[in-house]
């Protein structure tokens, strides 16, 4: 593939609006975890899309929210910094005629950076009367008149994604290929595996418990004789009571989380996986700067 142009695009928006789903849909494979709980994404994730002579590098970001911990501060910092040194911002919003505080803050930041902005109205597959999208468009145009394009789309069904890529291609700059062919994300395999385990906790556990967890891969190796991947994972939680809930009666919850994670990890790795999981208590880790840094969330 002869790549002659590149475009760095930040995908931003409030929590749970579908940023990771959109990134996964454009990349064509699952590189970012998805759940129905806010603040699923904690770090900036690069997704790579090659189309014709253009390489798109999508920056999937945490949802903008009011932080309640050092980790939350870090996540908000990631969002703000992701709007620097990119060609365009794709602002993802719900299909409702209301511009909330997160959208206003992001639009202000986009304006400060003098960034081209594409308004992406996601989840149109949930809209019964398509003419109601005109009210959404009017609400955003009233707040911000600088959108280069407004594109209704659905990350779930794929509607509007080709139109979005055609628009994003207009921001591509001449330059060398940033990521080699076949590379769809900047994340190491072990990072993706850890995130998959965290995704399963978000889906299996209720309320705030999964938000107080961190996942660390302590062993990642491939057996020479069989190609089986040995994966040891430690789940950190903030309270002893949470540890009991994560493990569950007779270890049933941890088995459920591990089994679901192993299936997705095997699909991602294309190999059999022997997964072992442990749960440890690390009190108030979200406000512990040293531990946060050890988990790859660099506050510098």
Ranges and model annotations:
Residues 189-300:
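P-loop NTP-binding site
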Residues 41, 65-66, 98-99, 127-128, ...:
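Catalytic P-loop NTPase motifs of RecA-like helicase/translocase cores
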Residues 10, 24, 43, 47, ...:
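Solvent-exposed alpha-helical segments within well-ordered globular domains of core cellular machineries
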Residues 50-55, 77-150, 221-225:
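Conserved C-terminal guanine-recognition region of P-loop GTPase G domains, centered on the G4
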Residues 116-118, 125-185, 189:
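Canonical P-loop GTPase G-domain recognition
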Residues 29, 48-52, 67, 82, ...:
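Conserved, well-folded catalytic cores of nucleic-acid-processing
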Residues 1-88, 93:
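Conserved G1/Walker A P-loop phosphate-binding module
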Residues 18, 160, 253:
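Conserved glycine(s) of the Walker
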């Amino acid at each position: 593939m002869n790549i002659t142009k590149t475009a760095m695009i930040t995908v931003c928006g409030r929590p749970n609006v579908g940023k990771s789903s959109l990134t996964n849909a454009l990349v064509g494979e699952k590189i970012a975890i998805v759940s129905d709980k806010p603040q699923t994404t904690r770090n900036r994730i690069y997704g790579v899309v090659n189309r014709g002579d253009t390489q798109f590098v999508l920056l999937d970001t945490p949802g903008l929210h009011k932080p309640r911990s050092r980790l939350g501060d870090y996540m908000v910092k990631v969002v703000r910094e992701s709007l620097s040194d990119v060609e365009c911002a794709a602002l993802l919003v719900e299909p409702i005629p209301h511009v909330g505080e997160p959208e206003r803050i992001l639009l202000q930041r986009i304006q400060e950076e003098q960034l081209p902005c594409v308004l992406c109205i996601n989840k149109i597959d949930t809209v019964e009367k398509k003419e109601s999208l005109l009210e959404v468009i009017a609400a955003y145009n009233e707040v911000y008149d600088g959108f280069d394009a407004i594109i209704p789309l659905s990350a779930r069904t794929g509607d509007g994604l080709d139109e979005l890529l055609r628009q994003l291609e207009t921001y591509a700059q001449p330059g060398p290929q940033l990521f080699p062919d076949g590379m769809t994300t900047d994340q190491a395999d072990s990072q993706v595996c850890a995130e998959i385990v965290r995704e399963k906790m978000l889906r299996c556990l209720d309320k705030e418990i999964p938000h107080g967890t961190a996942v660390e891969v302590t062993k990642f190796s491939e057996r020479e004789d069989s190609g089986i991947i040995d994966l040891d994972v430690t789940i950190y939680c903030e309270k002893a009571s949470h540890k009991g809930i994560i493990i569950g009666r007779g270890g049933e919850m941890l088995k459920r989380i591990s089994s679901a994670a192993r299936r997705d990890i095997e699909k991602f790795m294309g190999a059999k996986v022997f997964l072992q999981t442990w749960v440890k208590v690390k009190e108030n880790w979200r406000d512990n700067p040293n531990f946060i840094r050890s988990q790859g969330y660099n506050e510098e």
